[in-house]
Amino acid sequence: MNQQPTFSIITITYNAERWLERTILSVLSQSYPNIEYILIDGASKDKTVEIIKQYESGIASWISEPDKGLYDAMNKGLKLATGDYVWFLNAGDTLYTADTVQRIVASLKKKVSLPDVIYGETRIVDAEGRSLGMRRLKAPEKLTWKSFRMGMLVCHQSFISKREIAPLYNTEYRLTADYDWCIQCLRRSKRIHNTRLILSNFLEEGLSSVNRKASLKERYEVMCKYCLLYTSDAADE
């Protein structure tokens, strides 16, 4: 097993000057060396690009150009990634501590081969980075794709996939392509590793009531696609 895998951490931005620096610093301050940091900006009109340029020496690659939405931008990041793993951390989100990636790698030491998916817990923070407590949905001890019939049990920012099994995001979904993507990654996985660690701080921005309804509708469509309304984890044993 490769004892020192490379993590491609991808940050998507658009007019993110308020939060971007803390996200960048949380990645660049990691004690683990094998990190490929990629930023995809959607042609921001504020100082986002200036901030990116300020830290350019620590960034493997970045682009700033118009996109067709969040998931189109995420697909651009996937196409640029070359690491063993891909991990999305968007503007305002941060890695939990400066040794988070090092601790993930340490948790893999006894593994015969690298897992296909790595996951953990998530802490919620406000716009100022202050803790609001742990995410309401706790990551399950054992995770399968069928676990997602109960919703987004693992926050996207604490879900890490091997690049070789990670598909592009389905841009037909406007709000829940990440839910669909995680299910696809898990369906392609043979080895899934629970780190039992807090991996990320997730910026809680909240959905409008209109977007919340649209998100639930899309999630229902994804669940129907994978027959998640009619299955159980027991069927996966």
Which sequence ranges carry the predicted segments?
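N-proximal low-complexity "stem/linker" segments adjacent to membrane-targeting elements
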Residues: M1-S26
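Short aromatic/hydrophobic "clamp" motif used to bind/position activated sugar donors
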Residues: V86
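Conserved nucleotide-sugar donor-binding catalytic segment
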Residues: G120, M134-E218, V222
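Glycine-rich, basic loop-to-helix element that forms the pyrophosphate-binding segment
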Residues: E65-A81
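Conserved small/polar residues in nucleotide/adenosyl-binding loops
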Residues: Y230-E237
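Short, acidic, metal-binding catalytic loop of nucleotide-sugar glycosyltransferases
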Residues: S26-N34
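A conserved acidic beta->alpha catalytic loop
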Residues: D41-V49, N90
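Conserved donor NDP-sugar-binding/catalytic core segment of glycosyltransferases
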Residues: A98-L132
